[in-house]
Amino acid sequence: MAWPEKIRRLSVHGTLPYHRQQQRSGSQLRSLLMFGVGENLSLGKLFPGGCKLLGVLDYQDAPLNKFPVAVVDLYHLRYLSLRNTKVTMVPGYIIGKLHNLETLDLKKTCVRELPVEILKLQKLRHLLVYQFKVKGYAQFYSKHGFKAPNEIGNLKSLQKLCFVEANQDCGMITRQLGELSQLRRLGILKLREEDGKAFCLSIERLTNLHALSVASEGENKVIDLAFLCSPPPFLQRLYLSGRLQELPSWIQSLHSLSRLFLKWSCLKYDPLVYLQDLPSLAHLELLQVYDGDTLHFVCGKFKKLKVLGLDKFDGLKEVIVGEDTMPCLERLSIGRCELLKKVPSGIEHLNKLKVLEFFDMPDELMKTICPHGPGKDYCKISHIPNVYSTYWRDDGWDVYALDSFSRDCSPR
């Protein structure tokens, strides 16, 4: 297969049918994207003469088991993605020579540690090393990050850093984070309670931060964020996973916050009063956040909220929706609240609601809204175009539209 001598951008899908190596030149190639390539279609075989001007190399979804050695000669390489491959380690003698690298994408790989040579990449802006292992509902240990070199703060150009495991070397990593003043997105796993103060002091220095994700060492371990006095002023997305002794008071000052996920917080009081006046909040997810029996969405609050998820409130018996609250809400999901036997009181006020979804909710609740049975509350949700009941069964999701329920209010 021949192509122009001065080709600069190339996308390869699958395999090349006719391997005539002398017809392929990569001398002018700047960008190479490989999708679903065969195991034998390596960079060296594709371009025997090399492609030393290559700046972008994307191996996403390729059947790679090892870090591609051929990249050691790609001095001009700025972008390298090995996303969703089986690569397990990054050789220091290779990565340390890619001095112009700006993006290293190792998402969905098996890499769990980076060599100290990564610190030589002073132009590195995006460092993404993590993997999700989700089966069914959200699980605390479903996300795996990486161990970073202690001097990670030397990478002054970093803008995205996800997900670093912080429970190493007596909290050295948490102190180093404050040196990364250009960070816009930061993901931290396994933050120890005793490192909370050092972590907060570092976060206060990250004034350009737009997204912050923090997880404790375990779902019963505390995230201590009480020492954070001046949060990043432009923070838009905040994800906290782990016990909170109390909801950080500084959250109320985040006027740019549009997305907030709180998981396994186990608060003793209703957190909504501290969140309801956030002016930009559009997406709120709460999982095992509150031990009480009532959630009250007060009249006239949550003005911009479009998506709301409530999951695993073990003591929850009642949800109250006041008039003119959540006027923009389009999607509401409620899951695994075993004591909640009726739909939210006042749900009929949510005029813009397009999707209402229940996950493994009690049969008693579903019977109250069944259109073919005694559903006394069906009129409250009849204005919602899409109503679903979803169940986790046999390692998969079963989704039923409400109008498919039989007269005994069970999925057909």
Mark where each language-model region is:
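Surface-exposed helical/coil interface segments that assemble multiprotein signaling complexes
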Residues: 1-73, 79, 93-96, 103, ...
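Well-ordered beta-strand segments characteristic of repetitive beta-sheet solenoids
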Residues: 12, 34, 80-82, 104-106, ...
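Conserved "Asn-ladder"/turn position within leucine-rich repeats
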Residues: 15, 37-38, 62, 85, ...
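Canonical leucine-rich repeat
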Residues: 42-43, 67, 90, 114, ...
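Beta-propeller domains
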Residues: 232-272, 276
